[in-house]
């Protein structure tokens, strides 16, 4: 398990709701006239999501202005706009809205006596991997999983890239996961 939790936290719900609010603020989203509706809201929602996936250090590393004397910093802003457009070109706002809504429903303990009881039933060999800079699923969430899954091991990787570290820290993840394959 990596960069996840057994149930949605209030922190995660707040991020998801902020994205839905951006979608709902777009008048074309509310009109429901076409799948292109809500495109401006989708771009904004994506920008909000990106900030939640990344970290302060990661943005400073990748989005700092090349010109230290620039009057108006825009590299990070341009990146946010680019990522919003990129998503809007391949995804529709209505699907994004319900995908964000579905995240709020995550709770493996529902109907199973709570998360601790549900986790206690896991019999598979389990390694839980936390990312030290992940703000969406902080390491305390990963440690909770490892503490309640019988025989689970906890490993932590270091990343400057927040939650997206699970996509970017390939060497560290390989070091943790590869031994499981043998």
Regions found by a protein language model. Give the residues of each.
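Active-site nucleophile elbow and catalytic-triad environment of alpha/beta-hydrolase enzymes
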Residues: 82-83, 98-118
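Short beta-strand/loop motif that positions the catalytic acidic residue
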Residues: 122, 128-130
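Conserved alpha/beta-hydrolase "acid-adjacent" motif
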Residues: 135-141
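Residue-level signal for short, function-critical loop segments
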Residues: 5, 132-134
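Feature representing long, continuous alpha-helical segments
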Residues: 94-101, 175
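Alpha/beta-hydrolase-fold enzymes
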Residues: 3-86
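Short, conserved loop/helix-junction motifs that constitute active-site signature segments
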Residues: 119-123, 148-149
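Catalytic active-site module of serine/aspartate enzymes centered on a nucleophile-bearing elbow/loop
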Residues: 143-144, 151-182
């Amino acid at each position: 398990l990596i960069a996840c939790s057994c149930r949605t936290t209030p922190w995660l719900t707040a991020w998801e709701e902020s994205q839905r609010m951006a979608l709902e603020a777009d008048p074309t989203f509310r009109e429901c006239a076409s799948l292109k509706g809500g495109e401006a809201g989708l771009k904004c929602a994506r920008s909000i999501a990106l900030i939640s996936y990344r970290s302060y250090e990661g943005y400073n590393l990748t989005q700092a202005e090349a010109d230290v004397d620039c009057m108006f910093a825009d590299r990070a802003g341009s990146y946010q706009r680019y990522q919003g457009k990129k998503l809007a070109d391949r995804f529709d706002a209505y699907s994004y809205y319900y995908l964000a809504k579905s995240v709020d429903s995550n709770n493996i303990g529902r109907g199973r006596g709570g998360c601790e009881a549900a986790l206690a039933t896991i019999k598979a060999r389990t390694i839980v991997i936390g990312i030290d800079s992940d703000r969406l699923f902080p390491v305390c969430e990963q440690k909770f999983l490892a503490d309640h899954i019988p025989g689970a091991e906890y490993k932590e990787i270091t990343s400057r890239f927040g939650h997206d570290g699970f996509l970017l820290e390939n060497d560290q993840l390989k070091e943790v996961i590869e031994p499981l394959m043998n």
